[in-house]
Amino acid sequence: MYSQQPFPAFAFNAGLMQDPANCHFGGYTGLGHPQPFSFAFSTLKSENGESGVQGMGDCTTPVMPWNSLASFDHQVQMENNQQGNPPRAPSPTLSDSRIKVKEEVVHETDSGEESPEPKYPSPPNPSLYYPNAWTGAPFWQVNPTPGNNINPMPNQTLVKNTSLPGNTTYPTPANQSPNTPVDCVTSSMESSRCSSTNSPNGAINERATTIPNGEMLDGGQSSDNEEEVPSESEMEQFAKDLKHKRVSLGYTQADVGYALGVLYGKMFSQTTICRFESLQLSFKNMCQLKPFLERWVVEAENNDNLQELINREQVIAQTRKRKRRTNIENIVKGTLESYFMKCPKPGAQEMVQIAKELNMDKDVVRVWFCNRRQKGKRQGMPTVEENDGEGYDVAQTMGSPPVGHYALQQVVTPQGYMAAPQIYASAFHKNDLFPQTVPHGMAMGGHIG
């Protein structure tokens, strides 16, 4: 690179302003870097409060350049570089009387103690930097402000470098080890926000250190979360041992069910014990029932009075009153039939309303409708078939012959309901019905007048 000398500005009177159209660019008309030009202002106030006229001989205020980019003096930079001092980049937006920022060293604190992390040295001094017209300011900022902070990447740490101009703070990779050792510490921002998210492996290691020794298993699983679930072979062997122990002690499957009710308050039927021994229950249900049967085996071997307790429980169960069979009167049954013809599968609110009108229990009404639907299925009634919980309305047709060529059969519908459309009711879903076109002169019953 080379230093460029701008064309000297013209001097005008106090009341005139320089015309930028008259400025020349050193005789160069190419598309290269333009020379910085300046405007002359009439009256400016200096930093010390004295006023002067620009363009005159007694003007004490220099001409303000229009080039917003920083430019370096090559000779001064080379002298500073030979003396060991890094080049200092002047800021175009700050005056010469700006306040120098004091160098401060921020120590990382973690619960009042120094961080065990080693201090990272700064990289070597950078070479000369010449900004171009199409580039902005360098990535380090001179005299950074609180609003101009640099957020580090997850694998970077903020390093306070005292050798760069303006005590700049810049991100440095965590795995970098430059040759020049300089006293530098990490910023407090890292300790408060970035220390826990430095790397995903660090979070795993931190979580692993919190687990006590002996609880970590292969694959990162803990032994506390893993319950002892028996395998299918173990469950099959236990069922065989249970049956052998029960037969050898002289207990029946019903006795085992009664014994579980006496000992643990949970009575099981003979069918459940039989299905467990024949491995006909689901594996989940067998796992839930196995602990009770294991305790029963131990109790049957050690307790001699268990058989007496079982016999007493059987007597109590036989003397316990059973629920009487529900008998519905013929009038009530006819009313339920009429409701069933209107809606074969009523909802919960409809069942409650029917139960209130008939002065019956809701469960009785629910069971009656369920039995009535099953009866219709057994009889093969297509009008009562259910498709996804929906039933078809039932319409009774009278067999009277039609009168005239265009007469239709009379349809008798329940009170308060509209008559069913004159279409062919197929066995498909209710929404899948397609109307059938009827030729003129043909009745719905297939009779031609």
UniProtKB/Swiss-Prot annotation:
Keyword tags: Activator, Developmental protein, Differentiation, DNA-binding, Homeobox, Nucleus, Transcription, Transcription regulation
GO biological process: anterior/posterior axis specification; cell differentiation; gastrulation; gastrulation with mouth forming second; head development; negative regulation of activin receptor signaling pathway; negative regulation of BMP signaling pathway; negative regulation of DNA-templated transcription
Any one of the GO CC terms: nucleus
Localization per record: Nucleus
Gene3D superfamilies, sorted: Homeodomain-like, lambda repressor-like DNA-binding domains
Expressing tissues: Highly enriched within the animal half of developing embryos within ectodermal and mesodermal regions. Expressed in the neuroectoderm at the early neurula stage, with expression initially extending to the future hindbrain/midbrain boundary, but later shifting toward the posterior pole where it persists within the tip of the tail in hatching embryos. Expressed at very low levels in the adult kidney.
SMART domains: HOX, POU
Residue ranges: DNA binding: 321-380
SUPFAM superfamilies the record matches: Homeodomain-like, lambda repressor-like DNA-binding domains
UniProt feature, compositional bias: Basic and acidic residues: 97-110
Its job: Transcription factor that binds to the octamer motif (5'-ATTTGCAT-3'). Activates transcription when directly bound to the octamer DNA sequence, but can form repression complexes with other proteins at the promoter site to inhibit transcription. Binds to the promoter of the vent2-B gene to activate transcription when in the presence of other BMP signaling factors also bound to the promoter. Inhibits the competence of ectodermal cells to respond to BMP during embryogenesis thereby inhibiting epidermal differentiation and promoting neural induction.
Oligomeric form and interacting partners: Interacts with components of the transcription complex that assembles on the vent2-B gene, including vent2 (via C-terminus), smad1 and smad4. Forms a repression complex on the promoters of the gsc and mix2 genes via interactions with the nodal/activin signaling pathway transducers foxh1/fast1, gtf2ird1/wbscr11 and smad2. Forms a repression complex on the promoters of the nodal/nr1 and siamois genes with the maternal factors tcf7l1/tcf3 and vegt.
Protein's UniProt name: POU domain, class 5, transcription factor 1.1
Species, as recorded: Xenopus laevis (African clawed frog)
Gene from which the chain derives: pou5f1.1
